[in-house]
Amino acid sequence: MARLVFRKNGKVIENPEEIKSFLSQYGVVYDVWGVDRLPEDVRKNYDIDEENSKAIIQAYEKELKELKEKMGYITEDIVVLSEKTPNLDGLMAKFKREHHHIDDEVRFVVDGSGIFPVKIEDDIVDIHVEAGELIVVPAGARHWFELDENRKIKCIRVFKTPAGWEAIYNENETATMRD
């Protein structure tokens, strides 16, 4: 399950309700949707194809619809990062750079795990997420993404525009999800 680790003092929060309560103060959404409804072969398949993607999105159709209606999102896709991903280290170098977005960064973890370090007040809080968990990092929040020791994650991403996201590293440097 999720875990918050505060870099300044090493404090750890592991209780899901405490995590949800703490993060909500800063506009970060945390929720648990679970993965029990997905067959293991679909969940664990990192060779993503259209059939696999459709099965995953259909399994979470209700939650995705509610999220879209509540937050104004319009589209979703599946993203996979693993040792099979071409140029994984290059992608991770980009994701590990501190940035923000003009839209929320929405991820539901289907399988695997990862870490979203987020700047909160004068600290950096590592938000560890695992399969079955939803994280929404709000627009404007300074953050980055890291794979953990498992080096794999499979997520549903949700967007407000068909173009997806644009990372803003500083005033003069951006990257889009297509870079």
From Swiss-Prot:
Site features described as Important to generate the dianion, chain residue numbers: R107
Pathway(s) annotated for this protein in UniProt: Amino-acid biosynthesis; L-methionine biosynthesis via salvage pathway; L-methionine from S-methyl-5-thio-alpha-D-ribose 1-phosphate: step 5/6
Coiled-coil residues: none
Keyword check for Nucleus: no
Cofactor: how and how many bound: Binds 1 Fe(2+) cation per monomer. Binds 1 nickel ion per monomer.
Residues carrying the site annotation May play a role in transmitting local conformational changes: D104
Binding-site positions, Ni(2+): H99, H101, E105, H143
Key words of the record: Amino-acid biosynthesis, Dioxygenase, Iron, Metal-binding, Methionine biosynthesis, Nickel, Oxidoreductase
Site (described: May play a role in metal incorporation in vivo): E98
Transmembrane region(s): none
InterPro entries reported in the protein's UniProt record: ARD (IPR004313), ARD_bac (IPR023956), RmlC-like_jellyroll (IPR014710), RmlC_Cupin_sf (IPR011051)
Chain residues that bind Fe(2+): H99, H101, E105, H143
Catalytic activity: 1,2-dihydroxy-5-(methylsulfanyl)pent-1-en-3-one + O2 = 3-(methylsulfanyl)propanoate + CO + formate + 2 H(+); 1,2-dihydroxy-5-(methylsulfanyl)pent-1-en-3-one + O2 = 4-methylsulfanyl-2-oxobutanoate + formate + 2 H(+)
Domain of life: Bacteria
One Gene Ontology term from the biological process aspect of the record: L-methionine salvage from S-adenosylmethionine
GO molecular function: acireductone dioxygenase (Ni2+-requiring) activity; acireductone dioxygenase [iron(II)-requiring] activity; iron ion binding; nickel cation binding
Pfam families for the chain: ARD
E.C. no: 1.13.11.54, 1.13.11.53
Function summary: Catalyzes 2 different reactions between oxygen and the acireductone 1,2-dihydroxy-3-keto-5-methylthiopentene (DHK-MTPene) depending upon the metal bound in the active site. Fe-containing acireductone dioxygenase (Fe-ARD) produces formate and 2-keto-4-methylthiobutyrate (KMTB), the alpha-ketoacid precursor of methionine in the methionine recycle pathway. Ni-containing acireductone dioxygenase (Ni-ARD) produces methylthiopropionate, carbon monoxide and formate, and does not lie on the methionine recycle pathway.
Similarity annotation: Belongs to the acireductone dioxygenase (ARD) family.
Protein name stated in the entry: Acireductone dioxygenase
Organism listed in the record: Sulfurihydrogenibium sp. (strain YO3AOP1)
